Amino acid sequence: MKFRYFYSFPQSASLTAQFIVRLPPAIVCFDSLRDAPPTSEGAFRIGTNLFAKLKFEKEEVMKLKTTLLGKTYIFKDLKEVLAKANEEKTGDKLAGLAAESAQERVAAKVVLAAVLLSDLRENPAVPYEQDEVTRIIQDDVNEKVYEKIRNWTVSDLREWILSEKTSGADIRKLSRGLTSEMVAAVCKLMSNLDLIYAANKITVTAHCNTTIGLPGTLSCRLQPNHTTDDPEGITASTLEGLSFGAGDAVIGLNPVTDSPEQVGKVLRRFQEIKEHWEIPTQICVLAHVTAQMKAVRDGAPCDLIFQSIAGSEAGNAAFGFNAATIQEARDLLLHEGTAEGPNVMYFETGQGSELSSNAHHGTDQVTMEARCYGFARRFQPFLVNTVVGFIGPEYLYDARQVTRAGLEDHFMGKLTGISMGCDCCYTNHMKADQNDIENLASLLTMAGCNYFMGIPHGDDIMLNYQTTGFRETAALREITGKTAIPEFQRWLEKMGFVENGRLTAKAGDGSSLLF
């Protein structure tokens, strides 16, 4: 802890000592009383000049150093502490932000554990005046909740979250007083099992046409991507996925052609399938937000509007939108969309996206990812998922880093209070394989993840990456005793695809849904 003492002096005085710091007129700051010992009169002498005492003030300054095993580690600012407290990530190394050794990483964690939540509030990753994501995060804080916890340390927050006495409802209430930097900080002090245990406490639901995130459910986005956007190919994958029990979260396609006309064409095909078989679900085409808005204005049916988001204003600008665009899209869908709502937005994120567009502001990728969720919360989304390994080994090198990032992102999303899923995936040039992705999906199921992806054989031939297939979600439901969203589960049973919580012999036969 550091103390500062403030005293008055004549504005005409000549003060040249290095320890003197000029403040507003007539104020001088000394870092210790030794710099200007008091006289017997209670005034303070600098050279031959005598000055009367104006005020005494104690200011607590963050202690950003620690000594471990005889070596002292000093960090220049809170941003450096946050970065170096991260578990190893190649993206942070690429940005020049990572700890140089395991010892330095531990030292940063020790320092971070003692940081006050108020220090994190007052030192956002990007200044309030410069960044609308920061403004959204800060303005959305519940001040009454924050005042109760502002003097907690990050360690206090961690212990409280992990306490057996703390319920999920307790965490949801407290989360309204957290900024994204606080969320990221506590995440950095948790082990993988801590992240699973804590996230599993938290239930976050959202409603579009159905309600996702209910206890005892595990949902799946049906992702029928096609290399040429061929309607019949898309339909074939959609029907097959439905027969395996995929699609209760959303039937959502990434189009090859990002045009309003193509968006409308695919949405109409999805709506035709949904209406013919009376399927209780949501539909979406994951084009740019502006293309989807144009399609809706042209009369296309649409339940959810999608956009990839970043943790800074500059990152979102690189994606071609700002907060006003998202608000306009949400308002449009609430008035002209086909969903019940009120949750009609779908966002995707992923550690490292800000660095890829040089929009990270010298901030580590976990903290920037947490800021994505703070931004998303403003717009009350139905779905948010990290596409955890999609960006490649330059940001997450191997299966170990992908697993850690997936658990971090899921925990941070739920702690922020959003309906959180995960695209457990990897690229072909990453040191990971399908077994690693199944491991992550299994861990996230234990953590209470709301949904995964479902793609034929887990191989997205359009986006050229690997993720979970149709059978993975079905298997995880059976193992854990979970089901699809209740209305969708009843539809599966009615259609004969599921019986007693298990897939039937009819599962996988998409031809049974041809019409």
Regions found by a protein language model. Give the residues of each.
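Alpha/beta enzyme core
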Residues: 92-107, 112-115, 176-181, 188, ...
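Long, compositionally biased, glycine/small-hydrophobic-enriched stretches that function as flexible linkers
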Residues: 61-203
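Active-site-adjacent beta->alpha loops and helix N-cap segments on the catalytic face
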Residues: 198-209, 257-270, 292, 316-329
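Hydrophobic faces of well-ordered beta-strands that scaffold small-molecule active sites
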Residues: 218-224, 249-251, 281-287, 304-307, ...
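Glycine-rich, proline-tolerant flexible connector loops at the mouths of alpha/beta enzymes
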Residues: 174-175, 186, 190, 250-267, ...
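Alpha-helix-loop-beta-strand connector modules within alpha/beta enzyme cores
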Residues: 220, 262-287, 328-339, 403-420, ...
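N-terminal small/glycine-rich loop or linker at the start of catalytic domains
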Residues: 129-133, 202-226, 344-358, 420-422
